[in-house]
């Protein structure tokens, strides 16, 4: 997957979580679970706010789980399934 394709998915998802102040659980590759709200992000890091703001490097993140369902647009047109 090219970096551009990754950004097409990451940016709208993270931006929706940030804009709507959705509580998230972030699981790191070492198994640690962090909780809070996404304050900001860029190509390499996510700022996660709880009682303090933590800078979490994206390469250390395994999974981001929103506290509620969110919908976001990727800007790509989805192909309809063949009948």
From Swiss-Prot:
Residue ranges constituting the Sm domain according to the UniProt record: 11-70
Pfam families on file: Hfq
InterPro entries: Hfq, LSM_dom_sf, Sm
GO biological process: regulation of DNA-templated transcription; regulation of RNA stability; regulation of translation, ncRNA-mediated
Record has Phosphoprotein as a keyword: no
Keywords: RNA-binding, Stress response
GO MF terms, alphabetically ordered: RNA binding
Record carries keyword Cell inner membrane: no
Top-level lineage group: Bacteria
GO cellular component: cytosol
Function: RNA chaperone that binds small regulatory RNA (sRNAs) and mRNAs to facilitate mRNA translational regulation in response to envelope stress, environmental stress and changes in metabolite concentrations. Also binds with high specificity to tRNAs.
Family: Belongs to the Hfq family.
UniProt subunit comment: Homohexamer.
Protein name from the UniProt record: RNA-binding protein Hfq
Species whose genome carries this gene: Polaromonas sp. (strain JS666 / ATCC BAA-500)
Gene coding for it: hfq
């Amino acid at each position: 997957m090219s970096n551009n394709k990754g950004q097409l998915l990451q940016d709208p998802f993270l931006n929706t979580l940030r804009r709507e102040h959705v509580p998230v659980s972030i699981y790191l590759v070492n198994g640690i679970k962090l909780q809070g709200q996404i304050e900001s992000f860029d190509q390499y890091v996510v700022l996660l706010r709880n009682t303090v703001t933590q800078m979490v490097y994206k390469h250390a993140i395994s999974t981001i789980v929103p506290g509620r369902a969110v919908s976001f647009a990727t800007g790509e047109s989805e192909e309809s399934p063949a009948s």
